[in-house]
Amino acid sequence: MSRFKRGGKAPDPLSGFRAPKEQESAVPFGLIKAARKSGQLNLSARGLTEVPVSVWRINVDTPPEAHQNVDFGGSDRWWEQTDLTKLILASNKLQALSEDISLLPALVVLDIHDNQIASLPCAIRELTNLQKLNISHNKIKQLPNELQHLQNLKSFLLQHNQLEELPDSIGHLSILEELDVSNNCLRSVSSSVGQLTGLVKFNLSSNKLTALPTEIGKMKNLRQLDCTSNLLENVPASVAGMESLEQLYLRQNKLTYLPELPFLTKLKELHVGNNQIQTLGPEHLQNLSSLSVLELRYNKLKVLPKEISLLKGLERLDLSNNDIGSLPDTLGSLPNLKSLQLDGNPLRGIRRDILNKGTQELLKYLKGRVQTPDMTTQEAANPPDTAMTLPSDSVINAHAIMTLKTLEYCEKQASLIPEAVFNAAASSPITTVNFSKNQLTEVPARIVEMKDSVYDVNLGFNKISSISLNLCMLLKLTHLDMRNNALASLPPEMEALTRLQSIILSFNRFKHFPDVLYTIPNLETILISSNQIGSIDPIQLKKMTKLSTLDLQNNDLLQIPPALGNCESLRALHLEGNPFRNPRATILAKGTVAILEYLRSRIPT
């Protein structure tokens, strides 16, 4: 007869070694049993607040089935268990790890990411076989020096913690290949990282770094360095010696100039957007023979050098939201360029419709714009048969009219456009008219004859004092250049130009911002610098939802209304050279984003 009462339970021989019952129930016996065979245990997302003792002692204690199965001929050979090499405890509610972790010396992979752990146990030094350690998304503020004993560690993920420093002992992880310390509170990086000569991937993004150690240049095997979203004002020259580097991310810092990278012949991607870089010179480009991606958005570049053509392998170039006014023709010679981003630049001289057609059409346009060698004296004296000669000895290029659909009569100092010019274009659907740099006092009346086809008109550098109704009938017009004239107002009839995307009115006589511009729905660019404008209407400007570039430099603006900060579509706002006191020059120097943020902060609440 049994000595236990009917329905009673035998005493548990492992009592005192088990975790609380609710934690043990979260780890089914079958999982532990399977882990002894496979050497792998995944306990992620089980709501654990602590790790059951049975997990730490999985390879120490005799399993319960040993007391039930003594058949050495059975298939379930509990004594042939495998050491635990992989333990995943991710996405639980753990606040600490037990020192009993030392009972798992065979661990190769330990993943405890997405918990609430504030520190690591000193016993982690016993995990000398560990190759991958993921402690990301926790609350760790400091790393123990015991980590230096993990001499086989290859991948160390620490992102999204609260680290304020990396210990010098980090340099002892001699075969480390991947180190991610992004999204912490690091203000500096120990010079000992220079000892990590086997590192391939180093992520320092989203910290508070103001400088990088010179020793970082010793990482000769590093392929990817990410320093995005820090406070870096410069990059150590030693970076130029990281000869294996393929990807360099320096976005969202405080860089005012690009580092010279003469030896980075393997560099494929350079990301330096959202900085304060003002110049890009040939010294920055001449040795980057493998570069395929160059990202320079949201900087203060005014000039793109012709040496950009040195980057023969370039596939993507992002120059959006800079201060670039023109593009070098050599840009058209890049054979592999597939994506060119230019939004938010005050570009002049290139029709908006060409920009809208995409990268390939723009490159084709630039390539076709390359200057041919000057004609010899004999060629000039005997123009080719493809030209039509007017009585004034001026030449109209018939090829341009027939093939490029362009009618040019510029730089002639003419007060009138000869009738023969219009007659030559009578049978062609002209899309572009250029009568700039003459002495015209009014818009030529016969321009209306092209109303069904023309979308780009350049009448800049003349003496025109008013816009005629004939010009207002060019309903397909997308680009209008009236710079350097004598205009003081625009007619309300211009509201009919609903397709107009870009207008240049700089160097005229405007004392008021033309009201009619507020009514043109597709305007993206307004360049109206160097006039005498005294005020603007931010409410009306906010309604211009496509307006991305507004140049109001060198006017008479005594104040900038805070509500202008609500014009969220603006990507390039230029206000320099006006007599207002605020925003101050230091704010203006930071660029459009900073200006708009400042203005919004001044809106009364």
From Swiss-Prot:
Q: Where are the LRR repeats?
A: 83-104, 106-127, 129-151, 152-173, 175-196, 198-219, 221-242, 244-265, 266-287, 290-311, 313-335, 336-357, 429-450, 453-475, 476-497, 499-520, 522-543, 546-567, 569-590
Q: Which residues form a coiled coil?
A: none
Q: What are the protein's UniProt keywords?
A: Leucine-rich repeat, Repeat
Tell me which Pfam families the record gives: LRR_8
Does this UniProt record's set of keywords contain Repeat?
Answer: yes
Gene Ontology CC terms: cytoplasm
Looking up PANTHER family in the UniProt record yields: LEUCINE RICH REPEAT-CONTAINING DOMAIN PROTEIN, PTHR48051
Q: What is this protein called?
A: Leucine-rich repeat-containing protein 40
Native organism is: Xenopus laevis (African clawed frog)
